[in-house]
């Protein structure tokens, strides 16, 4: 589905694909990311403004001409904004992606299985989506690295932070 064709509205309504942000402050924060990027030279390909549905709804936004001095480059957005970056080499884009204090989730697209494993392992993020934008489900461990947290929620790993593991090795039991 093309980003322009996304249906904005009540997240519980049939056919709606983009719901509201949790609060007006959250929406204002996302808009501040967009405004910062545009003021520093980014281009809005689509979206970039509040939706007609209200102050908690932001149109899905694609930004190009994004540079490293923009907030969208370094910070977690938590809104429907996709900043697109240009790069020349795999090593360059990995360095760019990891050059942030945050590390919750990242996404990339590739058909090359070798590249998928190389890049996926090199990215410093708790969750990596490859050729997929919907990366959360009840079976997947959810959590980040760096300033995006430690530990995982959900999945079979969700209880690990609450457990103390003890190893007991016995010998000399021959009577």
Q: Locations of the language-model features?
A:
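Flexible, acidic loop-helix segments that line cofactor/substrate-binding pockets
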Residues: 4-32, 49-57, 74-79, 138-146
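A general structural signal marking secondary-structure boundaries and capping sites
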Residues: 6-10, 41, 166
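Generic structural motif recognizing short loop/turn segments at the entrances and edges of beta-strands
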Residues: 40-41, 54
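Short secondary-structure junctions
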Residues: 41-48
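Conserved C-terminal structural/oligomerization subdomain of aldehyde/semialdehyde dehydrogenase
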Residues: 50, 57-175
